[in-house]
Amino acid sequence: MPEQGIEAQLRLQRGAFRLDAHLQLPANGISVLLGRSGSGKTTLLRAIAGLERAEGFLQVGGQLWQDATCFRPPHQRSLGYVRQASELLPHLDVRANLEFGYRRIPRARRRLGLDEVIALFGLEDLLDQRAEWLPNGPRQRVAIACALLTSPDLLLLDAPLICLDRHSRAQILPALEQLRGQLRIPLLYVTHSQDEVTRLADHLILLDKGKTFASGPPGRLLSDPRLPLNHPDEAAVVLIGQVEHHDPHYRLSTVRVPGGTLSVSLSRLPPGAETRVRIFARDVSLSLDPPHNSSILNILRVRIADLFHEQDSARVMVRLDLDSACILARITRLSADRLGLAPGLQVYAQIKSVALME
């Protein structure tokens, strides 16, 4: 598929609800669609799949799927679609479900091998089981695998983990993370989970009342306090870094991120591997001078970009510039005034906790 992603302007009226979505998404990686319940996320995915007859324009990978003069029906759109509760062919076993779409794809067009996908999702012990007997977790693993084995040009995932327990989610997330760097197609992923956003998103789209109102790299959007992503207590940013080395004695790993290095819990990843860390604004304090003799391991020199005073609150959100990224600090207004904090001022960010997302 050409290195072109998704371009869409889709409009749809359903009673009092109106979808008016504008998308321009990268050609590969995971684009996460985030919004409140009822904001139109599922409706947008159904419109992209052709299951809802929306007006407008849709192009995927340089191929026109619809405009004012043409409309490809769902069966002519090269896509995989996995829902919250996916349906399999109940009378067939897991292997037959996997092979059903795979065998219909010409060998030259297959993006992934059958055995490769079986291993990726840990399906070896399920192959002879009837699909109708599968619990929710294994069922979703099989459903995602089936969608991938059709070698689609676009994969739509509508909150595929929302009904699963923690153990089942932990089996699927690493596979999706691996696919992100391996599969050269766009994935459009709906979720309500901040953990999933942190671990999976290469691109973030915010939807509210049927309209897309922000789109871009997660680091930029998550570090903008003006966007209604989280309650201020839960505000956090994600930094992409690289594992530098491990210290088995203290059970710590060093990760290089924009602006310096961070000590994190001992990682399973080898040195040189890319990883992601999450830093909550509530876990960051500020100092004008380099802290000495502190128990806090992670201290970065940063520059204040902006201060945002929270309405009817004693708190202020401070956005801090690193070399090519931002983090947030949520402190009291009293502390901000005492320190004389202002845009452009250089300070030291003391990070009490860093979560390694793996």
Curated annotation (Swiss-Prot):
Its EC number is 7.3.2.5. ATP binds at G35, R36, S37, G38, S39, G40, K41, T42. Residues 1-234 form the ABC transporter domain. It catalyses: molybdate(out) + ATP + H2O = molybdate(in) + ADP + phosphate + H(+). It holds the Pfam family TOBE. Keywords: ATP-binding, Cell inner membrane, Cell membrane, Membrane, Molybdenum, Nucleotide-binding, Translocase, Transport. GO terms for molecular function: ABC-type molybdate transporter activity; ATP binding; ATP hydrolysis activity. One of its GO terms (cellular component) is plasma membrane. Residues 293-358 form the Mop domain. It comes from the Bacteria. It is found in: Cell inner membrane. The keyword Oxidoreductase does not apply. Its main location: membrane. Belongs to the ABC transporter superfamily. Molybdate importer (TC 3.A.1.8) family. Part of the ABC transporter complex ModABC involved in molybdenum import. Responsible for energy coupling to the transport system. This is Molybdenum import ATP-binding protein ModC 2. It comes from Azotobacter vinelandii. The lineage of its organism: Bacteria, Pseudomonadati, Pseudomonadota, Gammaproteobacteria, Pseudomonadales.
